[in-house]
Design a protein with these regions (language model features):
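A solvent-exposed, charged loop/short amphipathic helix patch at secondary-structure junctions
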Residues: 98-116
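Metallocofactor- and cofactor-centric catalytic cores in central/energy metabolism, strongly enriched
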Residues: 2-82, 92, 105-106, 119-187
Length: 187
């Protein structure tokens, strides 16, 4: 996936420190399962590296994570390390290799023949930033939000097909401006 490399590095670092790790694939159901396991007391801390489920929730598409996504750990006061991985694009289910009319003016890539991935820009990316910070407003503390310096995933890294530094800057500024004071921001 578009976040696999960074996730694998993080897994190695957690293992070196003796943490037991459970990975959830951020495709909607994965995020919902993670939030449920937190509510049931089965998870004691969160490295939430993939927020594409939030973007998809905002736009009502494939990987929508549901209304509780990105809220439970903060409400419970669980330690969190957060990163907006994959939040700059959507995953839209389409007929094979078909570009939806409303997204033809966007940069895009096909993740697979039936998963269309457009880059979010302007007001679109601002909506996602606002939703992320709104979901985090109940965070009690013990949380860090990391803003990556080289893109939010494989598609948005230098040389990536969805690289858009102007949109990244807009997104990050909105995240900075809306981030609750209870969350430490790291760049």
């Amino acid at each position: 996936g578009v976040l696999t490399k960074g996730c694998m590095i993080a897994l190695d670092r957690f293992a070196e420190r003796g943490y037991e790790v459970v990975v959830f694939h951020a495709i909607g159901a994965g995020g919902r399962a993670m939030e449920q396991m937190m509510k049931e007391g089965l998870i004691g801390g969160v490295f939430d590296y993939a927020m594409g489920e939030i973007a998809d929730e905002v736009f009502g598409v494939l990987r929508a994570g549901g209304p509780e996504r990105l809220t439970v750990a903060g409400r419970l006061g669980l330690p969190q390390v957060l990163c907006p991985g994959g939040a700059e694009h959507l995953g839209i289910l389409v007929p094979p290799n078909e570009v939806p009319e409303e997204w033809k003016d966007h940069e895009y890539v096909f993740h697979s023949p039936v998963v269309f991935v457009p880059r979010l820009v302007g007001d679109e990316i601002l909506r996602v930033a606002k939703d992320i910070t709104s979901r985090l407003k109940h965070t009690k503390g013990n949380a860090v939000f990391m803003l990556p310096t080289d893109g939010t995933g494989t598609y948005a890294r230098p040389g990536g097909v969805l690289r858009d530094m102007e949109s990244d800057a807009l997104f990050f500024d909105a995240l900075r401006d809306g981030m609750p004071d209870t969350i430490e921001l790291v760049e």
